[in-house]
Amino acid sequence: MPPFLLLEAVCVFLFSRVPPSLPLQEVHVSKETIGKISAASKMMWCSAAVDIMFLLDGSNSVGKGSFERSKHFAITVCDGLDISPERVRVGAFQFSSTPHLEFPLDSFSTQQEVKARIKRMVFKGGRTETELALKYLLHRGLPGGRNASVPQILIIVTDGKSQGDVALPSKQLKERGVTVFAVGVRFPRWEELHALASEPRGQHVLLAEQVEDATNGLFSTLSSSAICSSATPDCRVEAHPCEHRTLEMVREFAGNAPCWRGSRRTLAVLAAHCPFYSWKRVFLTHPATCYRTTCPGPCDSQPCQNGGTCVPEGLDGYQCLCPLAFGGEANCALKLSLECRVDLLFLLDSSAGTTLDGFLRAKVFVKRFVRAVLSEDSRARVGVATYSRELLVAVPVGEYQDVPDLVWSLDGIPFRGGPTLTGSALRQAAERGFGSATRTGQDRPRRVVVLLTESHSEDEVAGPARHARARELLLLGVGSEAVRAELEEITGSPKHVMVYSDPQDLFNQIPELQGKLCSRQRPGCRTQALDLVFMLDTSASVGPENFAQMQSFVRSCALQFEVNPDVTQVGLVVYGSQVQTAFGLDTKPTRAAMLRAISQAPYLGGVGSAGTALLHIYDKVMTVQRGARPGVPKAVVVLTGGRGAEDAAVPAQKLRNNGISVLVVGVGPVLSEGLRRLAGPRDSLIHVAAYADLRYHQDVLIEWLCGEAKQPVNLCKPSPCMNEGSCVLQNGSYRCKCRDGWEGPHCENRFLRRP
């Protein structure tokens, strides 16, 4: 084999081994801007009189796979074109050894027809005769095109490895008023693409492999040249620095080696040192400027607070992915409340064992807790101390009552490093962590030390911890699994320890910490998420006095749960002469508001139907639209004397089939058969002899509810999808498959197709 053919074969082999996903173009912008470029490409729409001809390279150097990507790019561009005989006309050529007209500009009058025809294009193979294709268009024009008053656009999709000279025919085309876009595919030769493209080159040279970026660039140029206005007025075209890369084989000097050289003059062969070279694959970089359109996004104003992540949803909507403690509000601005007076000292491990990353996470945890809990009328005072070799009180307890000032002061606390002397820090915190002016007697607030650490202590902790607890300090520990045993020894109880598995899980401990600060070891499952609806029989058979007993019982039960949008949500439905929602799941986000609403629930009288009330809960209470949370256990507690329950068995089973537990509290000396059928399983029925005895069965009810709250859930039961959308389980989550005309995460938005 001749040497040059051998080299060519080696080059082809090496090029074929390079994965096509290598970054052949890089726009130097942030990930957020890249997302905006991608989003804008889907919103751009060209509706003007213009003739657009695609010229697709179908040669062997492109290959069948890259030809399919070229077709995908052309189809994506067509998605943004108002194709009709009067507006945008589209045609297509394929070229290799010879040019082949796939369809002229006047063949199809709808977008669907054009896209379907492009999909049917078949790869031909052959040489890359770009020059012949351009000359064909020079001699015959754009087939099916209109007169010169209509802008003519030629979009050439090629790898730029033509076997002829393309500069002259492309120049002549441009002189005739044809706007030429050169779109690279596979490993493009950018020099040839620049020779093909119209001026300015940065606006007319694109890369088909990055289809959304290329589509955006093409429509941005059309907008800038006033061919068609493809974006909304508030969108803007901006120039960004970018790089184009070309994969080439280059010869590299490798050294000298002994060789023999002949001389014609002496007819002798002489020993000498000859240079030798190696071939190497390299990316050659071409600096460029890329022009792209971006539109204002709903997340530009940073609406999500407290570390929440803003996720755009369409043009104007957004969703905040909030840490657990802040998930109850649209902007992660949930305010938890403390129902006791407390002096709180956060004790942060600033030793080398925790590391700088761990220390910074602890500071963020304190910031988020402070934002969630403190307010102008808060009865909590907060301080912060750090420790390694010794204790440093960085923010004395109560120094700041203004939340922004307190958060700002936390930013200035430095990481110190050094040994982890937790025992010494606990002793010093007990002695001087709360200052010397602490009130005594009943007027003194509860004093709490919250220790945050990820490393084992290098000194003894049991004695200092006992010393701190003897001074009436409540010790709470927050740490990784590795230090659980040590934290339990320090706090004196496993119930005073909060362990996290990863950095995000640390922030999920905020509501649990808030609950422990004022809790007195009440029964219940205060940190378990639950959607709970009480259904009260307020028919004439119950009577106003017994209804008041039921209200008192519901208030007492609800107090055993942490009522806020991140943990337990409570709703109340009453039924008698009619069915009425006293309050929905997401309408009373605090315990105080919920208790007031329970007391204000109306007594209806009349004849009640438990079945109708259960269907009301199924249709109008336990739904995503009314505040029910996907992935959270759900339960309904029915309190009734038994009358009107004859029609309730089927509706109750409907609730159970959709993942909603139903417990019946039947009151009266004898339970009716209808009430037994309503209850279903025997463990879903609590029999109470009289309304006055309800309070004696509270613990049994709470235990049952806590058990239900810990059961695994099916994210699609009840379905979170609206407007008859179908819920599909997928990779531990779910997605909603929407009917035609609806879109959105829960099929909540009506989708109007463009004409």
UniProtKB/Swiss-Prot annotation:
SMART domains: EGF (SM00181), EGF_CA (SM00179), VWA (SM00327). SUPFAM superfamilies: EGF/Laminin, vWA-like. GO terms for biological process: calcium-independent cell-matrix adhesion; regulation of insulin receptor signaling pathway. Pfam families: EGF, VWA. A 55 kDa form is produced by proteolytic cleavage. Residues 51-222, 343-517, 531-705 form the VWFA domain. Residues 296-333, 712-748 form the EGF-like domain. Disulfide bonds join C299-C310, C304-C320, C322-C332, C716-C727, C721-C736, C738-C747. It is found in: Secreted. Glycans are attached at N147. GO terms for molecular function: calcium ion binding; identical protein binding. Expression is generally absent in normal colon and other normal body tissues, but it is induced an average of 78-fold in Stage II, III, and IV colon cancers, as well as in colon adenomas and colon cancer cell lines. Forms monomers and multimers. May be used as a serological marker for colon neoplasia. This is von Willebrand factor A domain-containing protein 2.
